[in-house]
Amino acid sequence: MKIAIAGASGRMGRMLIETVLNTDGVTLAGALDVPGAAALGQDAGLFLGRETGIKISSDIEAVLSAADCLIDFTRPEGTLAHLAVAKRLGKKMVIGTTGFDAAGKQALADAAKSIGVVFAANMSVGVNATFKLLEVAAKLLSTGYDIEIIEAHHRHKVDAPSGTALAMGEVVAKAIGRDLDECAVYAREGHTGPRDAKSIGFATVRGGDIVGDHTVMFAGIGERIEISHKSSSRQSYADGAVRAARFLADKPSGMFDMQDVLGLK
C-alpha cells in the first residue's frame, strides 16, 4: 500500500514517516504540509538522515494522486479539506485528528459512503484494549460508583478534553445506558452543590511534554477502582495508524474505528 502523511514536519508526522519507512508491505508515497511550512521542498526523510526521494509538498492533489491512503493527524479544518480531495479522488484515509464538531463528524460519515475511512481518537492498541476493560468495568460498577475521567497532555495540545477522554466517556456511558451529551460535566467551579450521581466528570491537565495520560475512576464508598493508560511515546499511535491503513487495503468504502482494525468488535 502506498501511504501519504499529512502534517509531515510535525512531531506526529515525523513519527509516521519513520514508521512507514520501517514497515514491510507499505511505502511512503507522499508527504504533505501546510503552505508556508519551513520544511516544504525538503526530503521527507531529512530528519532521519535518510533520503526517501519524497519531497514535502503543500499540493494535496499531487500528494494524494500518488497514494492509496492518507494518514492525517492534523487539525479539524485541515483534515476536512484533505477529506474533500480524498473523496473526489477515491483515496482512503486514516484519521487521528481530534476536536471535530458535529458538522465535521457528519462530513466524515458522508465521505465514508464512498471511500474507506478509519477514524479513531486514539490508534494505540493499548488504549483500545483499555476501552474494552472500561466497558466491562462500567457494567459491573453502574450503581453506587461515581465516574470521573482525568486526562493530561503536553502544553501544545489545543483541544480539551482529549478525543481519547471523550471516547472513554462514550464507552462508559453506552455501557451503562446513558447519553454522554446529557450527563457529561466538563467544569466545576465555586459552589457546585452535591455531585449528580448520574454525571460523568472530566478533568483536564496541560503541561510540559506529557504524551498522554488517561485515568477513569470509579469511586465508591470504601473503595475506588482506577483504570489507566499512560503513553510514553507517540510510537504506539503511529504503529496503530499504519496498521489501520493496511486494514483499509480491501475496504472500498465504510467508516471504521480501531476496534474494527483490531477485531475487538
Curated annotation (Swiss-Prot):
InterPro entries: DapB_C, DapB_N, DapB_N_CS, DHDPR_bac, NAD(P)-bd_dom_sf. Its main location: cytoplasm. GO terms for biological process: diaminopimelate biosynthetic process; lysine biosynthetic process via diaminopimelate. The active site is at residues 153, 157. Its EC number is 1.17.1.8. It comes from the Bacteria. HAMAP family: DapB. NCBIfam families: dapB. The gene is dapB. It comes from Cupriavidus metallidurans (strain ATCC 43123 / DSM 2839 / NBRC 102507 / CH34). GO terms for molecular function: 4-hydroxy-tetrahydrodipicolinate reductase; NAD binding; NADP binding; oxidoreductase activity, acting on CH or CH2 groups, NAD or NADP as acceptor. Belongs to the DapB family. It catalyses: (S)-2,3,4,5-tetrahydrodipicolinate + NAD(+) + H2O = (2S,4S)-4-hydroxy-2,3,4,5-tetrahydrodipicolinate + NADH + H(+); (S)-2,3,4,5-tetrahydrodipicolinate + NADP(+) + H2O = (2S,4S)-4-hydroxy-2,3,4,5-tetrahydrodipicolinate + NADPH + H(+). Catalyzes the conversion of 4-hydroxy-tetrahydrodipicolinate (HTPA) to tetrahydrodipicolinate. This is 4-hydroxy-tetrahydrodipicolinate reductase. One of its GO terms (cellular component) is cytosol. Pfam families: DapB_C (PF05173), DapB_N (PF01113). It is found in: Cytoplasm. NAD(+) binds at residues 7-12, 33, 96-98, 120-123. PROSITE patterns: DAPB (PS01298). Keywords: Amino-acid biosynthesis, Cytoplasm, Diaminopimelate biosynthesis, Lysine biosynthesis, NAD, NADP, Oxidoreductase.
